[in-house]
């Protein structure tokens, strides 16, 4: 498996995510702030889900955190809720619409797990 958050890792996510069909267009952006700005975005739609490198033109929701926080959340050492509460994770955008994507995001999580992707 490629190094987490690398361009190769994003490509593996994209390949696995294509099996998931969304309901509506919705873009979720992830930004990791450190010495280098790492970003990717998940594009949900009525077609295959895509994961693309870089920042989206118009994300619906953006999650911003430093690399240590992103790693801790990904490894299960820190919950997103705790990171939000202590200010280590910042969420901006249409959070009410994000909540409506719960079912699609659960399918995406299952597809990534089935493909052995450590997201």
Regions found by a protein language model. Name each.
Residues 1-119:
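Feature captures hydrophobic
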């Amino acid at each position: 498996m490629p190094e987490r958050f690398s361009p190769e890792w994003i490509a593996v996510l994209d390949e696995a995510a294509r099996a998931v069909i969304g309901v509506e267009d919705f873009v979720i952006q992830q930004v990791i702030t450190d010495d280098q700005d790492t970003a990717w975005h998940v594009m949900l739609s009525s077609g295959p889900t895509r994961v693309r490198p870089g920042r989206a033109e118009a994300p619906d929701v953006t999650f911003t955190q430093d690399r240590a926080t992103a790693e801790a959340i990904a490894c299960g050492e820190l919950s997103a809720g705790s990171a939000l509460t202590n200010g280590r994770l910042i969420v901006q955008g249409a959070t009410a619409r994000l909540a409506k994507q719960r079912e699609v995001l659960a399918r995406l999580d299952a597809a990534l797990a089935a493909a052995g992707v450590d997201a």
